[in-house]
Amino acid sequence: MSNPTLTFVTGNANKLREVQQIFSLTPNFPYELTNKDLDLPEIQGTTRDVAQAKCAAAAKALGGACITEDTALGFHALGGLPGPYIKDFMKTIGHDGLNKMLDGFEDRTASAICTFAYCAGPDEQVHLFEGRTEGVIVPPRGPTHFGWDPILEIKGTGLTYAEMDPKQKNTLSHRYKALTLLQDYLVGLSKQN
């Protein structure tokens, strides 16, 4: 008997690869992960609000179980900005601009927040799973192909995400922490069925 399908709704190949790598660490993961890129409206609000609305819309569009993800990078000196709007900030001002936002502030600490959402299907409850990693904003270091990874030095490592090999990143990142909670939920759910 084959495993039920779970669709990860994303158009970001880097996120998809990380999720596949992290899920592969779970022996006998009870779902077959597929991927679909949907054009979904993104509301404005907290990361949790965005993740919940996006997942409900995706489940309705797909007519089945799905997961979505929303990521934020919050600068403590700016009260959590850019937060869930980091993607737009990156497109507009890039790594250097994000660094310049903190010029004049002693506090360069930041929180990376990942919220995964799971929905079993249309009109079903959306479940949220949040992971958080602390760090400090630094001038870009390492490859620049994956969002803001080069500017967040992770607390206690001396490395930015971009400087880490995928195995190291995928055992301590905000995405890993959120996915671990999601995996535990999904494994428990599969045992109930």
From Swiss-Prot:
Its EC number is 3.6.1.66. It is found in: Cytoplasm; Nucleus. It comes from the Eukaryota. It is an enzyme of class 3 (hydrolase). The keyword Protein biosynthesis does not apply. One of its GO terms (cellular component) is cytoplasm. Mg(2+) binds at E42. One of its GO terms (molecular function) is ITP diphosphatase activity. Pfam families: Ham1p_like (PF01725). Its cofactor is Mg(2+); Mn(2+). Pyrophosphatase that hydrolyzes non-canonical purine nucleotides such as inosine triphosphate (ITP), deoxyinosine triphosphate (dITP) or xanthosine 5'-triphosphate (XTP) to their respective monophosphate derivatives. The enzyme does not distinguish between the deoxy- and ribose forms. Probably excludes non-canonical purines from RNA and DNA precursor pools, thus preventing their incorporation into RNA and DNA and avoiding chromosomal lesions. This is Inosine triphosphate pyrophosphatase.
